[in-house]
Design a protein with these regions (language model features):
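Feature marks proteins synthesized as precursors that undergo proteolytic processing into two chains
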Residues: 1-180
């Protein structure tokens, strides 16, 4: 099942509100990886093991099954794995940030312009279209209405180190208790 993507929102809000770097700076390593990297054995073999399930989904099939019709359709260990569409999406976010900065917006405002493009602009259009094309339920309204909630983290000390984790909606309390 698919849910409204929250990771991009979380990253951009945290960067805008608490960070000092640009969106371009933090996305650069991901862009390099999307340009292509030698895939590790565990990932390549997992793709191969799950290829029948992957084949049910047009876009996943196009990304992960690099040798359609061959006995092994997944990439081999060490083969360069490329995610062109991911790279292009990340570049669009950077383009939006740069454009906003050129128009006089500050760093925070420029990051929120990229956020807006992802959740309300052409990227949102493509997410909604491709999801619905495959029977999914995510709409552009879902994307536009997505909100990030900033919460006070849980905290404990472990060997004189402060450890912070998310609140009770994940398994953080268990981890923090196990440290003590």
């Amino acid at each position: 099942s698919a849910v409204t993507p929250g990771t991009p929102a979380g990253i951009m809000v945290m960067l805008a509100e608490y960070g000092t770097m640009s969106l371009e700076e933090i996305l650069q390593p991901s862009i390099e990886m999307a340009r292509g990297y030698p895939i590790e054995a565990q990932a390549a073999n997992s793709i191969e093991r799950n290829k029948e399930e992957i084949k049910k989904w047009k876009y996943s099939k196009n990304i992960f099954l690099t040798k359609p019709g061959e006995e092994r359709e997944a990439p081999n260990e060490g083969e360069i794995f490329i995610q062109k569409d991911l790279r292009n999406t990340l570049l669009k976010l950077i383009e939006t940030e740069k454009s906003a900065l050129k128009k006089g917006k500050n760093r925070k405002e420029a990051i929120y312009e990229a956020y807006k493009r992802f959740y309300e602009g052409d990227i949102a259009d493509e997410i909604a279209r491709s999801t619905q094309e495959q029977g999914g339920l995510i709409t552009k309204k879902d994307l536009k209405n997505y909100k990030v909630f900033i919460e006070e983290p849980l905290k404990t000390s472990y060997k004189n180190i402060d450890v912070y984790k998310l609140t009770t909606w994940v398994q953080s309390p268990v981890l923090l208790q196990s440290l003590n």
